[in-house]
A protein has these predicted regions:
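Active-site segments of SGNH/GDSL-like serine hydrolases
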Residues: 517-544
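Short amphipathic alpha-helical segments and helix-helix/interface helices
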Residues: 13, 237, 459, 514-519, ...
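Hydrophobic membrane-embedded alpha-helices
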Residues: 2-3, 9-13, 19-402
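Structural motif
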Residues: 497-500, 526
Length: 615
């Protein structure tokens, strides 16, 4: 007798799904709530899927292998495709009605979502999961693509493994080693800076699925021992389950890692917590499984697929319709927008579960249509509802077609960045040794500017205001790149009198990096640190660190881009980060004020040397 109950219904899995989708919802809809790594909910889903699907496939059957494979794929299609088709067409149609940035790349997204290859299609298209320059209406289906690729390949590989590795411990060892290899590959990719590739890749993000597989192998045909039903075993199992939930929560509360520095550690922590929770739930006589499967959590868990499927597109649409940008930061989602999205996602998922997913899953598509046809003949209300649904379906298909046809080639943020790149490419100014300082005038030939995509978007305005300035700006550049760039310019004699640095948009700033840049600039030049403005949760810390450093270091001032642009968000692109032409002029004004402040500070200390760090 197996230790676990019938694979058709494992205790605790619905509750675990509810916890997983809850973490993802908080992470996306309420990013200021402190669940900075709520994306680990996806890894909980992966572990549950790996365990559940493998357990189902290991169940004894009298049917042939080919029949079982086809039956498995048919049931997966019934479960996933109807809701996905409705979500894609409805959301694409609404996006067409809204227009603008939300339509960018929608054809590619629909292709990836409908073929369950979204993760690879997105990578081929240069998508950056951790950037905010492109909304990507269906970005969340990348994880569904990973799972579907698993559903396609695993039924083909499992029979071969069962023949080659017959012993249970060999199967468990194989799955654990494969999971370790996947996690190692993610760490390698993250180390190379390919964070989105590491996160999206089926090969590099398969460790959760593989750990779930390992647990399914371990519990296969496990004998039911008397001690498993003892009070001590039940209490111990409950403690193990709570430890698992605790590990998941701890992982979700880890600080955000914009550069992926927490990968794969944080994701592995949540995966191990999921393993412990599943194990505690499926043990005979377990209290934990029943405790986690309380009715509210079970209700959410049953509908977790639909809630997850709908929540992100709805969030993008709500923010687009209300003129807000889409970002992963704490300021990126107004609380009201988060609640509106949550209510819509839960209501739509509940209706979809009852009216669409459950009938198709139980009866199949053809039998469901026959049942509707039979009621259509007898019931006027059914006739009205059916005709309304047909009209809505036609409108959704038409709207989806229009969305693809009318999608703009790039977002407003990408357009501003492209303009900056063209300005850099066409500039005539060349880096040259800085001239002797002039008393008060700001000459572009005295300026070296190093920055990220915000400075890049402002490059045309900088060249207009400071002809001859040298600007070195690049998309996704972090503060860690600053010292190397400044050091190279100084070594070549090309570092000018006024050094302007704007590198706070893409992650936190370490005071050691600021110290190194200031040392390289030296006591005879001015260092202007431009603070940051973006709907990202690390921005307040960045700006505070810049201000604190400038307050104790001579020759360093802060240019307040945040304060200058905050009242003029309408001058930013749709992502609420990158300035357009008018916003770029404000950026240039901020830089000019910063340089004048640095000149005034230098004039007040004609013979002073740099002060030591005071903290």
């Amino acid at each position: 007798m197996p230790a676990s109950p019938s694979p058709s219904r494992f205790a605790g899995l619905d509750g675990l799904r509810a916890i997983a989708v809850g973490l993802v919802l908080i992470y996306h809809l309420f990013p200021g709530a402190g669940v900075h790594s709520g994306l680990v909910g996806v890894d909980v889903f992966f572990v549950v899927s790996g365990f559940l699907i493998t357990s189902l496939m290991l169940r004894p059957s009298t049917h042939s292998l080919g029949y079982r494979m086809l039956d498995f794929w048919r049931r997966r299609a019934r479960r996933l495709l109807p809701a996905l088709a409705v979500a894609l067409t409805v959301c694409a149609s609404v996006a067409w009605a809204i227009g603008g940035d939300v339509l960018v790349g929608i054809g590619r997204q629909l292709l990836g979502a409908s073929t369950f290859s979204y993760n690879w299609v997105a990578l081929a298209g240069g998508s950056d999961y951790f950037a905010a320059t492109e909304p990507e209406l269906f970005r969340n289906v990348w994880s569904l693509a990973v799972e579907e690729q698993f559903y396609l390949l695993w039924p083909l590989l499992l029979p071969l493994l069962l023949v080659v590795l017959r012993a249970r411990w060999l199967l468990v060892a194989f799955a654990i080693v494969a999971a370790g290899a996947s996690a190692w590959w993610m760490s390698v990719l993250v180390g190379e800076g390919a964070v989105t590739r590491a996160y999206f890749g089926t090969d590099s993000h398969a460790f959760g699925l593989l750990l779930g597989i390992a647990l399914a192998f371990a519990l296969r045909d496990m004998p039911d021992r008397a001690w498993m039903h003892s009070s001590a075993a039940r209490v111990g199992g409950f403690a193990i389950g709570m430890l698992g939930i605790g590990l998941i929560v701890v992982a979700a509360l880890q600080p955000g890692h914009p550069a992926g520095s927490g990968f794969p550690g944080t994701l592995l922590l949540a995966s191990v917590g999921s393993l412990l929770s599943i194990l505690a739930g499926v043990l005979p006589g377990s209290w934990f499984g029943r405790a986690v499967d309380v009715q509210p959590l079970r209700w959410i868990g049953d509908r977790s697929y639909g809630i997850y499927l709908w929540h992100w597109p709805l969030l993008v649409l709500v923010l687009a319709a209300t003129g807000q940008g889409v970002s992963a930061g704490a300021a990126g989602v107004p609380v009201l927008s988060g609640w509106v999205t949550l209510v819509l996602a839960v209501v739509i998922a509940a209706v979809s579960f009852r009216m669409l997913e459950t009938p198709v899953r139980r009866l199949g598509l053809r039998r469901s249509l026959r049942a509707i046809g039979a009621r259509f003949k007898r019931n006027p209300l059914t006739r009205f509802a059916t005709l309304s649904a047909l009209v809505a379906a036609l409108l959704a298909l038409g709207g989806t077609t229009a969305a693809v046809a009318m999608a703009p080639p790039m977002t407003t943020a990408e357009a501003t960045i492209l303009a900056g790149q063209k300005a850099l490419k066409n500039r005539t100014a060349k880096p040259a040794p800085h001239p002797e300082p002039t008393p008060t005038a700001i000459d572009g030939n005295q300026i070296t500017a190093v920055g990220d995509s915000v400075m890049l978007a402002s490059a045309p305005a900088l060249y207009e205001r400071f002809p001859g300035a040298f600007v070195d700006a690049k998309v996704s550049r972090s503060s860690w790149k600053g010292p190397g760039i400044i050091d190279a310019l100084a070594a070549s004699g090309a570092l000018r009198q006024h050094v302007v640095v704007a590198l706070g948009t893409n992650g936190s700033i370490d005071r050691r990096v600021l110290q190194k840049m200031a040392d390289e600039v030296g006591p005879n030049r001015d260092l202007v640190l431009v603070n940051a403005y973006a709907p990202r949760d690390w921005i307040p810390g960045v700006n505070a660190e810049l201000q604190a450093f400038a307050s104790v270091r001579s020759g360093v001032v802060v240019a307040d881009w945040s304060g200058a642009i905050a009242p003029h968000e309408d001058l930013l692109a749709g992502d609420r980060i990158h300035p357009g032409a008018a916003g770029g002029r404000i950026f240039a004004e901020v830089v000019e004020k910063g340089i004048r402040d640095s000149e005034a500070e230098r004039a007040a200390r004609p013979h002073r040397t740099p002060e030591p760090m005071g903290y």
